[in-house]
Amino acid sequence: LCVAHGITREKIEENGSMRENIIDVTKTNRVFMQHIDVLENSLGFK
Protein backbone atom coordinates (compact mmCIF):
# COMPACT_ATOMS: atom_id res chain seq x y z
CA LEU A 1 0.00 0.00 0.00
CA CYS A 2 2.89 2.37 0.71
CA VAL A 3 4.24 1.70 -2.78
CA ALA A 4 0.80 2.45 -4.24
CA HIS A 5 0.68 5.77 -2.38
CA GLY A 6 4.12 6.71 -3.74
CA ILE A 7 3.02 5.95 -7.30
CA THR A 8 -0.20 7.91 -6.75
CA ARG A 9 1.70 10.96 -5.53
CA GLU A 10 3.86 10.90 -8.70
CA LYS A 11 0.74 10.53 -10.85
CA ILE A 12 -0.96 13.50 -9.17
CA GLU A 13 2.11 15.65 -9.84
CA GLU A 14 2.21 14.52 -13.49
CA ASN A 15 -1.49 14.73 -14.28
CA GLY A 16 -2.57 17.47 -11.91
CA SER A 17 -5.88 15.60 -11.69
CA MET A 18 -6.57 14.59 -8.10
CA ARG A 19 -9.96 13.04 -8.84
CA GLU A 20 -8.73 10.63 -11.53
CA ASN A 21 -5.99 9.41 -9.23
CA ILE A 22 -8.41 8.85 -6.35
CA ILE A 23 -10.51 6.71 -8.69
CA ASP A 24 -7.37 4.77 -9.73
CA VAL A 25 -6.47 4.16 -6.08
CA THR A 26 -10.02 2.96 -5.35
CA LYS A 27 -9.81 0.46 -8.22
CA THR A 28 -6.35 -0.68 -7.10
CA ASN A 29 -7.51 -1.16 -3.50
CA ARG A 30 -10.55 -3.16 -4.64
CA VAL A 31 -8.35 -5.50 -6.70
CA PHE A 32 -5.90 -5.75 -3.78
CA MET A 33 -8.71 -6.71 -1.37
CA GLN A 34 -10.00 -9.33 -3.83
CA HIS A 35 -6.47 -10.74 -4.02
CA ILE A 36 -6.32 -10.93 -0.20
CA ASP A 37 -9.69 -12.74 -0.17
CA VAL A 38 -8.41 -15.30 -2.67
CA LEU A 39 -5.24 -15.80 -0.62
CA GLU A 40 -7.24 -16.28 2.59
CA ASN A 41 -9.59 -18.74 0.89
CA SER A 42 -6.72 -20.78 -0.55
CA LEU A 43 -4.98 -20.85 2.85
CA GLY A 44 -8.20 -21.78 4.65
CA PHE A 45 -8.65 -18.64 6.76
CA LYS A 46 -12.31 -18.24 5.82
From Swiss-Prot:
Signal peptide: none
Species assigned in the record: Rattus rattus
Protein name: Major urinary protein
Job description of the protein: Binds pheromones that are released from drying urine of males. These pheromones affect the sexual behavior of females. Acts as a shuttle for pheromonal communication between individuals of the same species.
Tissues of expression: Found in many tissues including liver, urine, preputial gland, clitoral gland, submandibular gland and salivary gland.
Record: glycosylation sites: 15
Conditions for induction: Repressed by estrogen.
Keywords, ordered alphabetically: Glycoprotein, Pheromone-binding, Secreted, Transport
